[in-house]
């Protein structure tokens, strides 16, 4: 039986409250579960009362093979119970293919414009030197 440590929604409409439960992966989100190991009240301000976890039972279930979901793993990482690996994707922030092509064209046009300006400045400076030497 594959186990997950996940959130089960409770509370009323527009007032969410979640139980952190150990459940079979095939069970419905708010359905049958094995044990409640904590709670999360997102309505409260960020403090110690917002997330309550039973660290001993969570470690027991992780040792039994239960896998925490991403959100629960964030809570466990904040509490120091489990380590959440960082997801590093350095290429995510880069512009797309078309945007990179546009940037390359703009850079090339800028280089050509600066080269023309340098040639014009050199041409303007050259006659003055020739006149001074004669």
UniProtKB/Swiss-Prot annotation:
SUPFAM superfamilies for this protein: Ribosomal protein S16
Keyword DNA repair among UniProt keywords: no
UniProt superkingdom: Bacteria
Pfam families: Ribosomal_S16 (PF00886)
Region of interest (Disordered), ranges: 79-134
TM spans (from-to): none
Low complexity composition-biased segments: 115-134
Keyword list, A-Z: Ribonucleoprotein, Ribosomal protein
Protein's UniProt keywords contain Protein transport: no
Listed GO CC annotations: cytoplasm; small ribosomal subunit
Protein family (similarity comment): Belongs to the bacterial ribosomal protein bS16 family.
PANTHER family xrefs: 30S RIBOSOMAL PROTEIN S16, SMALL RIBOSOMAL SUBUNIT PROTEIN BS16M
Protein's name in the database: Small ribosomal subunit protein bS16
Organism encoding this protein: Brucella abortus (strain 2308)
């Amino acid at each position: 039986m594959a186990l997950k440590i996940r959130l089960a929604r409770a509370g009323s409409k527009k007032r969410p409250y979640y139980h952190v439960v150990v459940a079979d992966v095939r069970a419905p989100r708010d359905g049958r579960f094995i044990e409640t190991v904590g709670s999360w009240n997102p309505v409260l301000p960020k403090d110690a009362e917002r997330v309550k976890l039973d660290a001993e039972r969570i470690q027991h279930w992780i040792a039994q093979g239960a896998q925490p979901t991403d959100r629960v793993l964030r809570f466990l990482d904040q509490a120091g119970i489990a380590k959440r690996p960082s997801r590093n994707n350095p290429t995510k922030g880069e512009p797309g293919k078309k945007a990179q092509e546009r940037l390359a064209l703009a850079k090339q046009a800028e280089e050509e414009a600066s080269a023309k300006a340098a040639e014009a400045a050199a041409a303007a400076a050259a006659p003055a030197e020739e006149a001074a030497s004669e």
